[in-house]
Amino acid sequence: MPSHHLAEKMKNLNLPSPIQSITFQNQQFFLKRDDLIHPDFSGNKARKFYYFLQNDFPNITKIVSYGSAQSNAMYSLSVLAKMRGWGFEYFVDHIAEYLKENPHGNYRAAIENGMRLRQAQPPFLELVEGKNDILFIEEGGRQKEAEYGIKLLAQEIIDWQKDQDIKELNIFLPSGTGTTALFLQKNLLMLNAERLTLVFTTPCVGDKAYLQKQFLELESDEKYHPTILTLENKHHFGKLYKENYKIWLKLQQQTGVEFDLLYDPLGWRVLLAHPEVFSNPTLYIHQGGVLGNESMLARYERKYPSINLEL
């Protein structure tokens, strides 16, 4: 794609993303609407992949990545590739027959953007080694370049905090790989020494030990690590929990905002279970991902058809 088209697209990014005040379960929160950055390129993936949108890569002709066949990162990379005029190849170790035959959600949108899906077994890096025209992106965008866009997020929050004259701010966001939470805490501490801004998160994909390991892989100095909070019961990623569905519906009813169904319900359940966090003004980061709700919501509606009677 010619670069002037890219420049036009870039102008359309809604940055800094808006922050609004919401009330949920009789408690006031601030909400950072990263889901509104761009209709096709939003949330934490827009932050993680911002570096690849902003810089020149004259040798690159193709993006290669891997992960699940319904991932938000897969969809966002398909948009990035399309915006830059690159090919996009995505590896999965399995894909459900139902999804192949009935494409929907992130998978359908990525295919429509020109993604080529390939089945293979990890490690995937070996498949592209020695090819200098390929940009290889780790699963979920878990890499050092992600810090570039997340630093911008930190600066937006600092500017808003100063504008609102908030001395001590707590931030909450649910984590997959923990990349956003880690780089956010690190940059808030480095850029904003005179104010206390703490990042709290919860592991949605693995457990606390998994998340700590992810943090250490990206940053060895633990003073930059976010605070990890959890619920007492173990939570299995992607499993349908009635409590998750209920809180998601309540969020929509009380705030008018659609949240993601995979991460946000657990995020809000954990946050409400730790009221010590909102003893200070608390900012929740909406990280997008609502395109993936299509498949998840259908599963919830089939499993809990009379949920509204319980709200």
Regions found by a protein language model. Name each.
Residues 1-311:
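PLP-dependent amino-acid enzyme catalytic core
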